Amino acid sequence: FGNERATINFLDCNGTWEYRLPITMNGETIQLGTTGCYATICGEDMYIVSKKMNVSKPDVSDPTFVVCDAKTMKGKAVINSIKTAYGAADGRAFLPMPNLKKGYLSTTNGVYVISLEDYSVLSQIEGTGGYTNNQTGNMIYRDGKVYAVDQTCGLFIIDAVNDKLLKTINNEAEGSTYCSIVEAKDGSIWLT
């Protein structure tokens, strides 16, 4: 991973690239965080997650989470840092759940609940954070539950309505850690 600011690039249906699209908010260009690691579009919004250059300096402008209009690239919200005991949680991925008016932001300190109405940090999912050398990454939503891959703990299964950790499936017996999760067309869930 580099030390450059993250950028957004667009590939149109004709195969033409547009590089370093600016995101503007209140007449100013928003700088994304260092090393973009995830972006997703849901409805009209794009959610962009970036790592931080230095998690021990949470007040330095280095946004973890940026929301913009997916067509116009007009910024809607910026969360610079989610402060923790050691500085800041480093962003990994975002799962919007518009029917619940919230989304989950996975980080190096577990999973945080983000309001989709005002983009504030509502809470942290208890039991998902506080581990050394930890990172929670990709997540999927299905049947009222969120399945979140965690490098240290395995798979978190979270009640998405009540924001409660229901179960952790540990993968130590397999001799490795999970890295990602996907849902196939037939609805089956796969871990790698």
Model-derived regions: residue spans:
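Mid-chain, structured segments of secreted extracytoplasmic proteins
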Residues: 33-60
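Conserved beta-propeller blade signature
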Residues: 1, 45-48, 102-105, 112, ...
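Short loop/turn segments that connect beta-strands within beta-propeller blades
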Residues: 12-15, 69-73, 115-120, 159-164
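Repeated scaffold domains used in trafficking and secretory/extracellular systems
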Residues: 29-41, 83-100, 130-143, 174-187
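WD40 beta-propeller blade core
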Residues: 9, 66, 112, 156-157
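Short glycine/acidic-enriched loop and turn motifs that connect beta-strands
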Residues: 1-5, 52-59, 110-112, 153-154
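A short beta-strand motif characteristic of beta-propeller blades
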Residues: 16-32, 37, 74-86, 120-131, ...
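An edge-strand/N-cap motif at the start of beta-rich repeat modules
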Residues: 1-16
